């Protein structure tokens, strides 16, 4: 039983703009979705858990099918999925669920089109004895431990003094493993923080 991490997948039938904006190397959203499902199912077994740290789906007002088709991609994934809501899920909550996180969560957990094990605003995980805070926006990072986040896609880079961006664009569209996170933490402590101090 392993844990995996990603963010900013932006699944949904009308999500072509994300492919264009982020230069994702896929001809269309169908090819992108099919490849992501293949990668996730290749990496994560049915006993594993994938933490999606926001923006699993795309949501724009007046495109209700977009976020619903995006959430439905969860049915194609073999592993357990825990969704930390991002700004796109929050938009869906505000527009389609009367601003109620609980209604959105209930939809994700109980609607036959979805397969999520839980939906949370944020969470903590323990990775090999190190505590990490999971939240979508890096501006909401924890003060008492490292944070795994998304939201900035590739534009904010892989790491910050307070944690790591696990966005799909930063790992060749693959999931980050516990070992990946611990490797980055080791590099950060040994080199990256030192480099930052030298170059500031």
Explain the meaning of each model-derived region.
Residues 99-199:
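Conserved beta-sheet core of the metallophosphoesterase superfamily
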Residues 6, 11-121:
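Core catalytic region of metal-dependent phosphoesterases/phosphodiesterases
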């Amino acid at each position: 039983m392993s844990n995996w991490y990603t963010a900013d997948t932006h699944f949904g039938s009308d999500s072509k703009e994300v492919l264009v904006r982020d230069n994702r190397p896929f001809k269309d959203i169908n090819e992108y979705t099919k490849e992501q499902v293949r990668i996730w199912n290749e990496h994560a077994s049915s006993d594993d858990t994938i933490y999606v740290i926001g923006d699993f789906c795309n949501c724009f007002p007046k495109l209700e099918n977009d976020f619903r088709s995006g959430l439905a991609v969860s049915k194609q994934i073999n592993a357990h999925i825990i969704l930390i809501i991002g700004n796109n899920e929050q938009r869906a909550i505000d527009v389609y669920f009367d601003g109620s996180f609980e209604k959105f969560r209930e939809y994700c957990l109980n609607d036959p089109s979805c397969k999520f094990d839980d939906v949370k605003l944020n969470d903590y995980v323990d990775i090999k004895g190190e505590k990490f805070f999971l939240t979508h926006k890096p501006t909401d990072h924890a003060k008492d431990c490292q944070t795994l986040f998304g939201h900035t896609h590739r534009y904010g880079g892989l790491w910050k003094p307070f944690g790591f961006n696990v966005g799909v664009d930063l790992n060749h569209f693959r999931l980050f493993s516990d070992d990946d996170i611990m490797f980055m933490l080791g590099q950060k402590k040994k080199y990256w923080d030192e480099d930052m101090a030298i170059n500031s």
